[in-house]
Amino acid sequence: MKFSIIIPSWNNLEFLKLCISAIRKNSSYPHQIIVHVNEGADGTAQWVKEQEIEFTFTPENAGICRAVNQASELAAADYIVYMNDDMYALPRWDEILADEISKVPGDCFMLSSTMIEPYDTGNACVIVADYGRFAENFNEKKLLEEFSSLNKKDWSGSTWPPALVHRKWWEKVGGYSEEFSPGMSSDDDFAMKMWAEGCRIFKGVSASRVYHFVSKSTGRVVRNNGRIQFLKKWGIKQSMFHRFYLHRGEPYAGALKDPPFTFPYFAESVLAHIQKQLS
């Protein structure tokens, strides 16, 4: 099964080379790779041309939302995968996602591969195991030997990359909302748009794995206040969306349901309403 893999990149060529290399050698199927080159001051545009990789370009950093939207215009496959440029896809990552697709009724769902990260960020959805934090000290051999033995169950609450969604639904919800540029909280906003369209399957697939170097580019940009934007747009806090809707980080238990009107939900709703009025 062929995917259209969208990778935004901002002067991060060494990680991008690793990312593309891993997709090419560790995928079970040939995929369409589309890079959005932000600025490209480090030679990224020239390199992707030499590699005959499809790409879109902006002379400045367009931010995640605009970048993935521009790249998605070139997507030809039925399924779009949004992947970060500091990710290393592990063997059969795509085959396992394709198998998962065949088990899900319909095409309205979000799936994520499971990230392995070198240090603990408090994210219950990832596996913590250090195989290097930079391209130059990446222990690829050890990772390939050990990644499949790292313990993790399927988890609920898929919203972040590597994220897979049918192109029909990507287009129906309008891709990523550019009012969230440069991108803080844009993953949750996209998931909430999918929820509003009736999507109730947000599954993190344990056996499909990528190594994530956690190379932060957000420190180089002026951040949008995504939490307040999300609250004003949807009337709930992101923490409510994670806890009551997505059950993020909990063992996967099937399609999600609308949150029951319990006292904790009521209390959080009241606080969210007050915060929205004050913001």
Locate each region found by the language model.
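A recurrent flexible, glycine/aromatic-enriched loop bordering the glycosyltransferase active site
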Residues: 65, 143-168
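A conserved acidic beta->alpha catalytic loop
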Residues: 29, 37-46
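Short, acidic, metal-binding catalytic loop of nucleotide-sugar glycosyltransferases
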Residues: 21-30
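Glycine-rich, basic loop-to-helix element that forms the pyrophosphate-binding segment
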Residues: 58-75
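Short aromatic/hydrophobic "clamp" motif used to bind/position activated sugar donors
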Residues: 80
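Active-site donor/metal-binding and catalytic loop motifs
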Residues: 116, 181, 203-221
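A short, conserved alpha-helix in the catalytic core of glycosyltransferases
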Residues: 156-174, 180-209
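Conserved donor NDP-sugar-binding/catalytic core segment of glycosyltransferases
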Residues: 91-131
